[in-house]
Amino acid sequence: MRNNVERRMQRVNEACRLLSKDTEMRRITDQNRQSRESEGTSPNSGKDGKDHFELTLNVRDFSPHELTVKTQGRRVIVTGKHERKSDTE
């Protein structure tokens, strides 16, 4: 009987841990959404037209020389390398 109670307690503890993790992820998602709305930016998006595909990415923090766009077969690969300057410079 004691093992049964211990197993149930483990399940309850695991459920609490997962719920806590889910709550934290929802909070972060809400903060990101509110931040985008206050900045007037939209999340990355794309749409498929009949003869073309259009994709919009937020690259505000990158300068043009930090971005690379390549095609590889039917794929479009966008990479960005952004060097942050330290406060000591």
From Swiss-Prot:
Gene Ontology BP annotations: protein refolding; response to heat
Molecular function per GO: unfolded protein binding
Biased composition annotated in UniProt, kind: Basic and acidic residues: 1-11, 19-39
Keywords: Stress response
Domain of life: Eukaryota
Record region (Disordered): 1-55
GO CC annotations on file: cytoplasm; nucleus
InterPro entries: A-crystallin/Hsp20_dom (IPR002068), Alpha-crystallin/sHSP_animal (IPR001436), HSP20-like_chaperone (IPR008978)
Limits of the sHSP domain: 35-89
Family as reported in the entry's similarity comment: Belongs to the small heat shock protein (HSP20) family.
PANTHER family: HEAT SHOCK PROTEIN BETA-11-RELATED (PTHR45640:SF2), HEAT SHOCK PROTEIN HSP-12.2-RELATED (PTHR45640)
Protein name per the record: Heat shock protein 30A
